[in-house]
Design a protein with these regions (language model features):
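Surface-exposed molecular-recognition determinants
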Residues: 2-4, 10-339
Length: 339
């Protein structure tokens, strides 16, 4: 990535709109075909992931989320309320260039097409003592704006440290040792409303999730909600902040037209998750590998088990994305969407 000046000097091209020289060193989508064989190495991720979200694209298996804090063999499903479970037949280890799978069908079904979204945080991390609750582990990557936090809830107003050094704009919470709904904070909704990742519902008033207090550059406020701060229960929060040229959480208004709304991000997205916050609809997930060309970018739903869906959905552009459908989950006229 070099260029030459008028006097023939060779200089490195710096992309002014990005603070991360190589975004694929912090997030990458990996596709593979399962073989139902133990100790199958999935390589080419480009880094050792600290969070891996897997979905079997060919079947109606659950989504499976793994991270370095809970341990590689423990999975939890975004589409369900079931508790964190150990699945030794699924993901076996996080490796320097990817991960290893055993023979389980959700991640390695024979002949089945599977996707894994990979994020780099900071390994297992360590306890963060910035808040009134000392976290068990905070795995924070200040470069990519990704932090994974585990802590024990108190059931009363409290704070926890996220370690990012900048304000999180999107946070997914879960009481993971018991059956429970997922709770999602999004900056465009404010701290007194939330969404549920496992459900289709619109935004809802929720003053007890974050105690109606927006996150700061160091702390997340918690209220008494069992979804974010259940007394005596292990909790987890996956936190993301905006990073110029790499990640962004925002909102847009649908226009109900196949020549849909254009959403400016300032960079070409590699992963998009959308929710209609105005009314009931599925969540929607896209990436730059399934199919990887416009307009046929495949669709998955994090709130249900539906297999990969093909169709005319959206364009991934150099500076954002553009909707190409009038579906309620993406471009209903006048509806507000979070991404």
């Amino acid at each position: 990535n070099w260029l030459r000046t008028a006097n023939n000097k060779r200089i490195k091209r710096i992309m002014a709109y990005s603070t991360i020289p190589k975004s694929s060193s912090y997030f990458n989508t990996k596709l593979w075909t399962g073989n139902s064989t133990n100790s199958t190495a999935i390589t080419g991720v480009g880094f050792q992931p600290d969070m891996v979200w897997i979905k079997n694209r060919s079947t109606t298996d659950n989504h499976a989320i793994f991270d370095a804090i809970r341990g590689a063999t423990y999975r939890i499903a975004s589409n369900a309320t079931t508790a964190n479970t150990q699945a030794t037949n699924s993901l076996a280890s996080f490796d320097s260039d990817g991960f290893t799978l055993n023979d389980g069908g959700d991640a390695n079904g024979n002949g089945e097409n599977i996707v894994g979204w990979n994020w780099k945080a900071n390994g297992q991390g360590s306890s963060n003592t910035d808040g009134s609750i000392n976290t068990t582990y905070t795995s924070a990557n200040t470069t990519s704006g990704c932090s994974i936090i585990t802590y024990t809830g108190t059931g009363a107003n409290a704070t926890i440290g996220h370690g990012l050094g900048k304000v999180p704009t999107f946070i997914i919470f879960r009481r993971y040792a018991q059956a429970e709904n997922w709770n999602v904070y999004h900056q465009s909704l404010g701290a007194a409303k939330s969404l549920r990742l496992n459900e289709t519902g619109a935004e809802a008033n929720d003053t007890t999730a974050l105690n109606s207090t927006a996150p700061t550059s160091s702390l997340i406020s918690l209220g008494s909600s069992v979804n974010t701060n259940a007394s005596g229960n292990p909790m987890i929060a996956w936190c993301f902040s905006d990073v110029q040229g790499f990640s962004k959480a925002g909102s847009y208004t649908g226009n109900g037209n196949a020549d849909g709304t254009f959403v400016y991000t300032g960079f070409k997205p590699a992963f998009i998750m959308i929710k209609n916050s105005s009314s009931s609809s599925d969540w929607a997930m896209f990436d730059n590998k399934r199919q990887g060309y416009n307009v046929a970018n495949n669709l998955l739903y994090p709130n249900n088990t539906t297999a990969d869906t093909t169709g005319t959905f959206l364009d991934l552009l150099s500076n954002g994305f553009k909707m190409r459908t009038t579906a309620s989950w993406s471009n209903e006229n006048g509806a507000t969407y979070t991404y």
